[in-house]
Regions:
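Bacterial N-terminal signal peptides that target proteins for export
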Residues: 2-12
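Bacterial N-terminal signal peptides
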Residues: 11-22
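Sec-dependent signal peptide cleavage junction
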Residues: 20-40
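PDZ/PDZ-like groove recognition
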Residues: 40-76
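PDZ domains, with a preference for the canonical peptide-binding region formed by the helix
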Residues: 82-113, 316-318, 323-327
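Serine endopeptidase catalytic core focused on the charge-relay Asp
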Residues: 124-288, 292, 301-302, 310, ...
Length: 330
């Protein structure tokens, strides 16, 4: 997706992380690699395998209203991989399949909850004579995320949780672009809804590539990484007590904010190893607590990287979860 040369307000990736990942702390591996502190916000355009079905619509035909995909057994949340001989990765691929359509059923390959299925879909002509499917699809994602750490070669880890759909299923990412970004505002949380950072891409030129989407974060590589612009950081294990997060909530420069690590749990197979509470009055004044878009913010304790912010409590924006850094390293 091309980033247009204008201020573009971006939706922040949802802080939904339901996937499982095993844990085992290994300081020996961490000590052999030089890590650099993140805390900066990057913009992502992510290409996913297939096209996700996000809704249906009726097609007005000479014989009344029709909804071919819905009638063929396709469900919201399904991912379309193929239509006949056409591989589907974008809305344009769907259009191409319809342009080549002659008659009869199209055998459509979909993924539903991780299971591959074949369904038969019969396109219909609308009043203009064009074939339609009566479906809304999403073929790529755009958003902001906070980097947790970099390595010397420019590779980075961010978010601390997967990029998932509304059903909590991890997107199958096949690539994407990375852009510099700036934060231009915040929406503070309410008692029933999490707040979020608001930002925009800076420039049209990509500064890196997305490489993978995992249960413990979104990974990529910066093309021209300048290590002198980032602080070296050692790796350690979190324990209850005072700590800080390193996060960007205004502009492009990250700052340290005080938090308390309330609880640690290294036996849970999730992204919720740490319970944290914001204790920094300045941050609470600016944001009202942890916001969507802050996920991935490094958690620093005694000068060492111990984890990353992953979730916010909906009923208490000052509290949230963090992931142990070792999970992201592995």
């Amino acid at each position: 997706m091309k980033v247009k040369n204008k201020v573009k307000i971006l939706a922040i990736f949802l802080l939904i992380a339901l996937s499982i990942f095993s844990f085992g702390f290994s300081s020996a591996n961490a000590e052999s690699i030089t890590y650099y502190l993140g805390g900066d916000v990057l913009g992502f355009t992510i290409n996913t395998k297939g096209a996700e079905v996000v809704g249906f619509c009726d097609v007005i035909t000479d014989n009344g209203l029709k909804s071919p995909c819905k009638d063929g057994g396709v469900l919201v949340g399904d991912v379309i991989y193929n239509m006949g001989d056409c591989e589907i990765n974008s809305a344009q691929d769907v259009a191409n399949a319809l342009n080549n359509y002659k008659s009869g059923e199209i055998v459509t390959k979909i993924s539903r909850k991780g299971e591959i299925k074949l369904v038969d879909v019969i396109p219909v002509k609308d009043l203009t004579g064009e074939y339609k499917l009566g479906v809304y699809i999403r073929d790529d994602l755009t958003g902001l995320g906070t980097v947790t750490f970099y390595k010397e070669d420019g590779s980075f880890a961010s978010l601390g949780h997967p990029v998932s759909n509304q059903l909590g299923r991890l997107y199958d990412v096949v690539g994407g672009e990375v852009y510099n970004s700036t934060i231009i505002g915040v929406i503070k949380p309410t008692k029933s809804k999490a707040g979020e950072l608001r930002g925009m891409f800076v420039g049209e030129k990509s500064v890196g590539k997305i490489t993978k989407n995992t249960n413990v974060g979104l990974y990529g590589k910066i093309s021209d990484f300048n290590e002198s612009e980032h602080k070296k950081v050692e790796i350690s294990k979190a324990k209850p007590g005072k700590a800080q997060i390193y996060s960007t909530v205004d502009g492009m420069i990250p700052k340290y904010y005080d938090i308390e690590i309330v609880k640690t749990d290294y036996f849970t197979n999730s992204n919720k190893n740490l319970v944290i509470k914001i204790s920094d009055d300045d941050l609470l004044k600016i944001t009202g607590g942890i916001l969507q878009g802050m996920s991935g913010s490094p958690i620093i304790q005694n000068g060492k990287l111990v984890g990353a912010v992953t979730h916010v409590f909906i009923n208490d924006g000052s509290r949230g979860y963090g992931i142990s850094i070792d999970k992201m390293l592995n």
